[in-house]
Amino acid sequence: MNRPFNDQPIETLIDQNLANEGTVLDLRLKYISDDGMEFLSSCPKLVSLQELKLERNDITDKGIQILAGSTILTGIKSLNLERNSIGDEGVRSIALSPSFSRLTSLNLWKNEIGSDGAKAIADSLILGNLQRLDLAKNKIGDDGGKALAESQTLTSLKYVDLFGNGISQETQEIIKESLNFKNLQHLVLE
């Protein structure tokens, strides 16, 4: 297996960073890349995983597609993919994968997500339990912002961060006034 940036194999990283009786795995800044996602997605030790932190790991759409196809990681409630290289295809994989039906928190801050990725989230029947969505510092634009505001499935959201997405003032008002965000307690637009 390829060794990540910190020169430890993924097997060792999992052993060292798996916590809370196997429910939390924190691999932030380990640079496991898409190759590490292969092992992670098929590791039987992770069958009880509920929280997965993968910030800054050089993960692309390919790695997310591998994760979305996992038959082991089906109980994840919180997924942090902050500061990777995930685009619309990767987000579409998350939005369509039954493995993510329990997600309540999805952090995609500072990736490469455009309006199609935001639309995939907005249209997802899988992500109806989401309470927290962070899409800050992506490129969803007005079309992506409107799609989220018009979503019939994201009604459980309590926190949404869309800062730094090139969303116009007009679309920001549409988002603020969305009746679909009836449970929203915190909205970040600028």
Model-derived segments and spans:
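LRR N-terminal entry segment and analogous cap-like coil->beta motifs
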Residues: M1-Q65
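Short, solvent-exposed loop/turn at the beta-strand->alpha-helix junction
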Residues: F5-I10, Y31-E38, D58-Q65, S85-R92, ...
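Eukaryotic tandem repeat interaction scaffolds
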Residues: K77-L125
